[in-house]
């Protein structure tokens, strides 16, 4: 199961005692700020979590895996996330719920 923005807002309501409407708006504003920063080419560093960066990919030749036909893959910008050391350690040491 995936964690959603709604669930994040609900967790803020439970843990911090925020009003539900304020918690939802906080989550939306948080992600909007990350989007704006990435759109303008800025790196987003979240201490203890990881870094989001934007990279420019050059155009390159590719191949359609179904048909084997050669195709051109156009140049594009992509978002890259690199997990921080603390996050990597916590995920590595986490006990998986069955």
From Swiss-Prot:
InterPro entries: Hist_DNA-bd, Histone-like_DNA-bd_CS, IHF-like_DNA-bd_dom_sf, IHF_alpha. SMART domains: BHL. GO terms for cellular component: cytosol. One of its GO terms (molecular function) is DNA binding. Belongs to the bacterial histone-like protein family. This protein is one of the two subunits of integration host factor, a specific DNA-binding protein that functions in genetic recombination as well as in transcriptional and translational control. This is Integration host factor subunit alpha. It comes from Glaesserella parasuis serovar 5 (strain SH0165). The lineage of its organism: Bacteria, Pseudomonadati, Pseudomonadota, Gammaproteobacteria, Pasteurellales.
């Amino acid at each position: 199961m995936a964690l959603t923005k709604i669930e994040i807002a609900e967790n803020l309501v439970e843990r911090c005692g925020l009003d539900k409407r304020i918690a939802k708006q906080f989550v939306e504003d948080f992600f909007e700020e990350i989007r704006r920063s990435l759109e303008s080419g800025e790196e987003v560093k979240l201490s203890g979590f990881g870094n989001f960066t934007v990279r420019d990919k050059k155009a390159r030749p590719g191949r359609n895996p179904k048909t084997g036909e050669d195709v051109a893959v156009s140049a594009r910008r992509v978002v890259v996330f690199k997990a921080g050391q603390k996050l990597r350690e916590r995920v590595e040491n986490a006990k998986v719920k069955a």
